[in-house]
Regions:
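Generic structural motif
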Residues: 48, 76, 158-159
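Residues in the recognition helix of alpha-helical DNA-binding motifs
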Residues: 96
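Primarily a LysM-type cell-wall glycan-binding module
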Residues: 69-89, 100
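N-terminal trafficking/processing presequences and adjacent post-cleavage segments
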Residues: 1-6
């Protein structure tokens, strides 16, 4: 998204700017609408700027939906605890393969992830440490940044999206 003369304290104009950056690869969708084949769901929120916020001019934040999760088993995990965390049947975890610490298992979970800034990896948990089934219902109140306003949902093509410095509209 071009960042010239824009505020992130409200949603006004942001969804249109997202689409204008990749007009053939992004379209608006309703939050519960299934995306076309080859697309995935993204939800956008803003943190209104306030003098007490870490970023006074506001900030925007995206959550990305994943139908399938690749999960590395940690010490202390059980099939039941992983199923409970992702809010899925335990049988789905059992079908994912041998349950051994350090092993990656792949299963359907239909959860969202997000990134807190450029320097972090994707997170599957909200501000309370819970899995994110619907970002609108998740805890988005992080220290200094409360992404309290839902803006829009989009469906994004799986490949070919331009972001950051790779896009000519981005400064």
């Amino acid at each position: 998204m071009s960042n010239v003369d824009h505020s992130y304290t409200h949603c006004r104009g942001l969804p249109a700017r997202v689409i204008s950056d990749n007009p053939t690869r992004v379209y608006r969708a309703k939050p519960n609408e299934k995306c076309k084949k080859g697309y995935y769901k993204v939800m956008m929120f803003v943190c209104p700027g306030r003098p007490t916020n870490y970023i006074r001019q506001g900030d925007f934040h995206f959550y990305v939906q994943h139908g399938v999760v690749e999960y590395r088993i940690k010490p202390g995990d059980t099939q039941a605890s992983v199923a409970k965390f992702f809010k899925i049947p335990e049988s789905r975890i059992k079908r994912a393969g041998k349950f051994v610490v350090g092993k990656c298992i792949v299963f359907r979970a239909n959860v969202f992830s997000h990134k807190r800034g450029w320097a972090t990896g994707p997170l599957l948990v909200d501000a309370s440490g819970k899995s994110i089934k619907d970002p609108r219902k998740a805890n988005r109140n992080y220290p200094g940044l409360n992404y309290s306003r839902y803006c829009s949902s989009f469906c994004v093509k799986n490949r070919g999206i331009k972001v950051g410095k790779s896009h000519s509209n981005i400064i």
